[in-house]
C-alpha cells in the first residue's frame, strides 16, 4: 500500500522511505482506531437502516392493513347505514301506506256516505218521480174527468198547466242533477281505479327493488367476507415477509461483519508488512545510530573523566579558598582588636611622620626634578600597562577556553537531551565550578598584580633609599636607618592595618555590589513581573469580555439554532403533511376509483334492472289500462244493457232497487280496487324514477370528484403555482439547513475558542500564582538584602569617616590643602577610564544603530575630535587598566561583558588607586580590586578627594 502511494507521489527509490515519528504513529494508530470505530458505526448504521427499512415495510403493511380494516369498517358502516336506510324507507313506506290506507278508508267512507246519500237522494227522487208519474197519471185521469166535467173552467185549467210546467222543470233539473252526479261518480271511480292500478304497480316495483336490495346486501356480505379472508391472508403474508426481512437483516449484518473482519485482517496484514519493513529500516538506522552513539559515548566518557579531574582540582581550590576565607575572617576579628591598639600608635606615628614627610619633601624636591618624576611615572605606567596586557591576554585565553568549554557543554547538551537527572546535576555543578574557577582566576591574577605592584614599589623605594644613602653622612645615615627601621616597623603595622581595612572594605564593597546587582535584578524582575501581571490582568479582562461576548453569541446562536430547529421542524412537518396528504389523496383516489367502479357497476346493474322494471311496469300499465278501458267499455255496455233490460224487464220495485244498488256497489268496489292498484303502481314508478334521478346525481358527483382527483394527480407543470410554491419551500428548507449548519459550525468554533481561552486563562492563573509566589520570595529576599545593605552602609560610613580622617591627617602632615600628585594621577586615570568607557558605549551604539555613525562623525568633527574606531577598543581597553585596582575592575567588567556593558556599571566599577607618601621617599600604592589589601585604600582615596 505504501509502495503504491510512493509510486503515485513519484518517490525516488534511491532515497529511504520516510518513516513517521512517535507522534505521527500515535496519530496513525488513532486514525486506525477511528476508522475501525467508523466501520463499526457504519455496520451499526446499516443494521439500523435494515431494521428501519423492515419496520417501514412492516409499517406500510400495517398501514395498508389498517386502511383495509378501515375500508372494511366503512363497508360495514355503509352496510348498516344502507340497512338502516332501507329500514327507514320501509318504515316510511309503511307509514305512508298506512296514511294512504287511512286516507283511502276515510275517502272510502266519505264516498260510501256520499254514495248512500246520493243513492238515498236518487231513491227519493225516483220515488218522487214515481209519485209524480203516478200523480201525473192520476192527474191526467182526473184532468180528463175534470175536462170532461169542467171544460168551461179555463182559469183552473191554466193553473193546472202552470203547475204541470213547473213540475216538469223540476223533473228536468232533478234529472240533470242525477246525470251530473252519475258522471262525477264515474270520474271518481275512474280516478280510484287509476290509483289502484298505480298502487299495485308501485307495490310490485317496491317488491322487486326490495328483492334486488336483498340480493345486493347478500352479495355485499359475501364480498365483505371475501375481503376479510384476503385481509387475513395479507396479514399472514406480512408476518411472513417481516420474518423474512428480519432474517435478511441478520444475514446482511453477519455478511457485513464478516466483510469488515476480512477487511480488518487485510488491513492488519498490510500494516504488519509495512511495520516489518519499517522495523527493518528502523533497525538499520538504530544500529547505525547505536554505533555513532557508542563512539560518542566513548568520547563523552573521556570528556567526563577529564572534567571530573578538573572538578576534583576545582574542589581542592574551593576547599583552599574556604580555609583562606575562614582564616581571613579570624584575622579580621583579631585585626579589629589590633586596630584599637594601633590607632593610638598611629596618632603618635603621625606626629613623627609629619616631620619626616617635611624632610622627605625637601629631599625629594632637591633630588628629583619634574622630568625625572615624569620619567618615573611613565616607566611606572608602561610597566603597569605591560602587566595589564599580560593579564588581558591571560583573560582572553581564559575566555577562549571558557567559550570552548561552553560550546562543548552546549554540544553535549544538544546531544544528550534524554540523559538522566544525574548528568543535569553534574552540568549545573560544572557551571558553578566554572564560575568559581573564573573567580579564582580573577583572584589569582589580582594577587599577581598586587605582588608585581608591591615588587615595583619596593624597587622604587630601594632606589630612593640608595640615592639618599649616597648623599648623607654616617650619623645621619645611622639616624635615618634607625628611623627607616622604625618607619618600616610602623609601615608594616600600617600595612597590616591597611590590609585588614582593605579586606573589610573590599568585602563590604563586594557585598554592596552584589546587593546592588541583586536589587537591580530584583527590581528588573519586579518591573517585569508587574508588567507581566498587568498584561495578564489585561488579558484576563479582555478574555473575560470575549468570554462574555462569546457567551452572548453562544446564547444568540442557541436561540437562533432553536428557531432554526423549530423552522426546520415546521417545514419538515409541513412537508410530511403534504406527503401524507398526497399519499392519503392517492389512497383516496384508488379507493374512490374502486368504489366508483363498483358503484358504476351497481348503478349499471340497477339501471338495467330499473329499465327492465320500467318496461315491465309500462307493459303492465298498458295492459292494465287496456283492461280498464275494456272493463269500462264493458261496464258501459253492461250499464246500457242493464238500463235497457231494466226498462224492458221492469222488475218489481223492491227487487229492482236491490239489484241496482248491489250491482252499483259491486262495480264501484271493483273500480276502487283497480284504482288502488293503479295508484300503487304509479307510486312505485314515481319512486323508481326519483331513485334513478338520485343515482344519476350521485354518479355526476362521483364523476366530478374523479375529475378533480385526476386533475390533482396529473403531473404538475413548472409554470404552475403549486410547483413554484414547492420550489420556494425547498429553497427555504435548503437555506434554513445551510444556516443551521453554519450556526452549528460557528457554535462549535466558539466552544473551541472558549475552551482554549479557559485553558489559557487557567495557565495564566497558574503563572500568576507562580509569579506571586516568586514575588513574595523576592520581596522577602529584598527585605533581607535591605537589612544587609543598611548594616553594610553603616560599616561603609564608618570606613568613609576613617578614610576622610586619614586624608586630613595626610594633607595636614604635608601641610597642603590642595590635591596631592597621587590624587591628580588617580583623577587622570579615572578620566581616561571614563573616556574609554564612553568610546566603548558609542561603538556599541554604532554597532546597534549604524545610522548614528554619520551623526556622531559630524559632532566629533565640529568639536575637533576624532571618532573612535573599533580597532582601537582593545588597546584602549587594555590601556585603561594601569593599576592592579583597575585590573580587578576590568576583570569584573570582562566577566559581565556577556550580560551588558553600560557606562553606569563601568563607572561604578572604575578603578581608583591611592599612593600614600610617607615623607621618606616611600610610597604605597593601594589599588581597588577584589583583594582586601587594595579595596580599602582605593575606597578611602575616592572618598578623600574633597575633604
From Swiss-Prot:
Disruption phenotype: Defects are the cause of a phenotype related to primary ciliary dyskinesia (PCD). Embryos display heart-looping defects at 36 hours post-fertilization and bilateral or lack of spaw expression at the left lateral plate mesoderm in 14 somite embryos, consistent with compromised fluid flow at the Kupffer's vesicle due to impaired ciliary motility. Disulfide bonds: none annotated. It comes from the Eukaryota. Residues 866-947 are annotated as: Disordered. InterPro entries: CCDC39. Keywords: Cell projection, Ciliopathy, Cilium, Coiled coil, Cytoplasm, Cytoskeleton, Primary ciliary dyskinesia. GO terms for biological process: axonemal dynein complex assembly; cilium-dependent cell motility; determination of left/right symmetry; epithelial cilium movement involved in determination of left/right asymmetry; inner dynein arm assembly. It is found in: Cytoplasm, Cytoskeleton, Cilium axoneme. Pfam families: CCDC39 (PF24161). Residues 16-194, 221-402, 471-522, 582-813 form a coiled coil. GO terms for cellular component: axoneme; extracellular region. Residues 866-911, 926-947 have a biased composition (Low complexity). Belongs to the CCDC39 family. Required for assembly of dynein regulatory complex (DRC) and inner dynein arm (IDA) complexes, which are responsible for ciliary beat regulation, thereby playing a central role in motility in cilia and flagella. Probably acts together with ccdc40 to form a molecular ruler that determines the 96 nanometer (nm) repeat length and arrangements of components in cilia and flagella. Not required for outer dynein arm complexes assembly. This is Coiled-coil domain-containing protein 39. It comes from Danio rerio.
Amino acid at each position: 500500500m505504501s509502495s503504491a502511494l510512493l509510486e503515485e507521489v513519484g518517490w525516488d527509490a534511491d532515497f529511504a522511505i520516510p518513516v513517521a515519528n512517535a507522534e505521527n504513529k500515535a496519530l496513525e494508530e488513532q486514525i486506525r482506531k477511528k476508522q475501525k470505530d467508523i466501520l463499526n458505526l457504519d455496520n451499526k448504521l446499516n443494521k439500523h437502516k435494515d431494521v428501519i427499512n423492515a419496520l417501514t415495510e412492516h409499517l406500510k403493511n400495517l398501514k395498508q392493513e389498517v386502511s383495509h380494516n378501515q375500508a372494511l369498517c366503512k363497508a360495514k358502516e355503509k352496510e348498516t347505514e344502507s340497512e338502516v336506510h332501507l329500514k327507514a324507507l320501509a318504515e316510511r313506506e309503511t307509514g305512508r301506506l298506512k296514511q294512504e290506507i287511512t286516507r283511502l278508508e276515510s275517502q272510502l267512507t266519505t264516498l260510501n256516505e256520499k254514495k248512500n246519500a246520493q243513492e238515498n237522494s236518487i231513491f227519493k227522487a225516483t220515488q218522487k218521480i214515481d209519485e209524480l208519474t203516478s200523480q201525473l197519471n192520476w192527474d191526467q185521469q182526473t184532468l180528463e174527468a175534470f175536462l170532461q166535467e169542467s171544460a168551461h173552467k179555463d182559469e183552473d185549467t191554466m193553473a193546472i198547466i202552470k203547475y204541470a210546467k213547473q213540475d216538469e222543470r223540476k223533473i228536468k233539473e232533478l234529472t240533470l242533477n242525477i246525470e251530473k252526479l252519475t258522471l262525477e261518480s264515474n270520474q271518481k271511480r275512474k280516478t280510484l281505479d287509476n290509483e289502484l292500478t298505480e298502487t299495485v304497480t308501485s307495490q310490485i316495483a317496491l317488491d322487486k327493488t326490495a328483492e334486488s336490495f336483498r340480493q345486493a346486501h347478500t352479495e355485499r356480505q359475501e364480498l365483505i367476507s371475501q375481503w376479510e379472508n384476503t385481509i387475513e391472508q395479507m396479514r399472514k403474508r406480512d408476518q411472513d415477509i417481516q420474518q423474512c426481512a428480519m432474517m435478511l437483516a441478520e444475514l446482511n449484518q453477519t455478511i457485513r461483519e464478516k466483510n469488515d473482519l476480512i477487511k480488518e485482517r487485510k488491513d492488519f496484514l498490510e500494516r504488519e508488512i509495512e511495520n516489518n519493513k519499517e522495523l527493518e529500516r528502523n533497525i538499520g538506522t538504530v544500529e547505525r545510530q547505536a554505533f555513532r552513539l557508542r563512539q560518542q559515548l566513548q568520547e563523552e566518557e573521556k570528556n567526563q573523566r577529564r572534567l571530573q579531574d578538573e572538578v576534583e582540582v576545582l574542589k581542592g581550590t574551593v576547599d583552599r579558598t574556604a580555609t583562606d576565607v575562614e582564616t581571613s575572617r579570624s584575622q579580621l576579628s583579631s585585626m579589629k582588636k589590633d586596630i584599637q591598639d594601633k590607632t593610638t600608635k598611629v596618632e603618635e606615628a603621625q606626629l613623627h611622620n609629619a616631620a619626616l614627610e617635611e624632610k622627605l619633601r625637601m629631599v625629594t624636591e632637591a633630588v628629583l626634578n619634574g622630568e625625572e618624576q615624569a620619567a618615573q611615572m611613565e616607566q611606572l605606567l608602561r610597566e603597569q600597562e605591560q602587566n595589564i596586557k599580560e593579564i588581558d591576554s591571560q583573560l582572553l585565553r581564559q575566555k577562549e577556553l571558557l567559550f570552548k568549554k561552553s560550546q562543548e557543554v552546549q554540544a553535549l547538551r544538544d546531544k544528550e537531551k534524554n540523559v538522566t537527572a544525574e548528568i543535569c546535576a553534574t552540568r549545573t555543578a560544572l557551571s558553578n565550578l566554572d564560575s568559581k574557577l573564573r573567580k579564582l582566576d580573577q583572584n589569582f591574577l589580582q594577587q599577581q598584580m598586587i605582588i608585581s605592584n608591591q615588587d615595583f614599589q619596593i624597587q622604587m623605594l630601594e632606589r630612593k633609599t640608595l640615592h639618599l644613602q649616597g648623599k648623607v653622612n654616617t650619623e645621619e645615615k645611622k639616624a635615618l636607618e634607625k628611623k627607616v627601621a622604625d618607619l618600616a616597623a610602623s609601615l608594616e603595622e600600617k600595612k597590616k592595618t591597611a590590609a585588614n581595612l582593605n579586606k573589610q572594605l573590599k568585602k563590604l564593597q563586594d557585598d554592596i555590589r552584589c546587593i546592588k546587582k541583586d536589587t537591580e535584578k530584583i527590581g528588573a524582575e519586579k518591573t517585569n513581573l508587574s508588567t507581566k501581571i498587568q498584561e495578564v490582568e489585561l488579558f484576563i479582562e479582555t478574555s473575560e469580555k470575549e468570554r462574555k461576548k462569546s457567551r452572548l453569541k453562544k446564547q444568540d446562536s442557541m436561540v437562533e439554532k432553536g428557531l432554526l430547529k423549530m423552522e426546520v421542524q415546521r417545514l419538515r412537518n409541513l412537508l410530511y403533511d403534504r406527503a401524507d396528504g398526497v399519499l392519503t389523496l392517492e389512497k383516496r383516489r384508488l379507493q374512490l376509483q374502486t368504489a366508483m367502479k363498483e358503484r358504476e357497476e351497481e348503478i349499471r346493474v340497477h339501471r338495467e334492472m330499473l329499465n327492465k322494471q320500467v318496461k315491465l311496469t309500462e307493459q303492465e300499465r298498458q295492459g292494465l289500462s287496456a283492461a280498464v278501458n275494456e272493463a269500462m267499455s264493458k261496464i258501459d255496455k253492461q250499464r246500457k244493457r242493464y238500463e235497457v233490460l231494466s226498462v224492458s224487464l221492469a222488475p218489481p220495485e223492491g227487487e229492482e232497487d236491490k239489484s241496482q244498488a248491489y250491482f252499483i256497489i259491486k262495480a264501484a268496489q271493483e273500480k276502487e280496487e283497480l284504482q288502488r292498484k293503479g295508484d300503487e303502481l304509479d307510486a312505485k314508478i314515481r319512486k323508481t324514477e326519483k331513485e334513478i334521478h338520485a343515482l344519476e346525481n350521485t354518479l355526476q358527483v362521483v364523476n366530478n370528484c374523479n375529475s378533480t382527483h385526476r386533475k390533482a394527480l396529473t403531473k404538475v407543470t413548472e409554470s404552475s403555482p403549486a410547483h413554484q410554491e414547492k420550489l420556494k419551500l425547498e429553497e427555504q428548507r435548503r437555506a434554513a439547513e445551510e444556516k443551521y449548519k453554519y450556526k452549528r459550525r460557528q457554535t462549535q468554533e466558539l466552544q473551541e475558542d472558549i475552551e482554549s481561552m479557559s485553558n489559557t486563562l487557567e495557565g495564566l492563573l497558574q503563572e500568576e500564582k507562580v509569579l506571586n509566589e516568586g514575588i513574595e520570595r523576592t520581596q522577602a529576599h529584598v527585605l533581607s538584602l535591605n537589612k544587609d545593605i543598611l548594616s553594610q552602609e553603616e560599616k561603609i560610613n564608618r570606613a568613609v569617616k576613617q578614610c576622610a580622617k586619614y586624608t586630613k591627617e595626610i594633607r595636614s602632615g604635608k601641610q597642603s590643602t590642595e590635591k596631592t600628585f597621587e590624587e591628580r594621577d588617580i583623577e587622570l586615570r579615572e578620566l581616561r577610564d571614563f573616556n574609554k568607557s564612553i568610546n566603548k558605549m558609542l561603538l556599541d551604539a554604532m554597532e546597534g544603530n549604524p545610522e548614528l555613525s554619520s551623526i556622531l562623525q559630524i559632532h566629533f568633527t565640529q568639536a575637533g575630535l576624532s571618532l573612535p574606531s573599533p580597532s582601537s577598543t582593545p588597546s584602549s581597553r587594555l590601556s585603561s587598566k594601569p593599576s592592579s585596582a583597575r585590573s580587578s575592575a576590568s576583570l569584573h567588567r570582562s566577566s559581565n561583558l556577556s550580560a551588558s556593558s553600560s557606562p553606569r556599571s563601568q563607572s561604578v566599577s572604575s578603578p581608583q588607586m591611592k599612593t600614600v607618601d610617607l615623607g621618606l621617599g616611600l610610597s604605597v600604592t593601594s589599588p581597588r580590586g577584589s583583594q582586601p589589601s587594595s579595596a580599602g585604600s582605593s575606597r578611602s582615596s575616592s572618598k578623600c578627594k574633597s575633604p
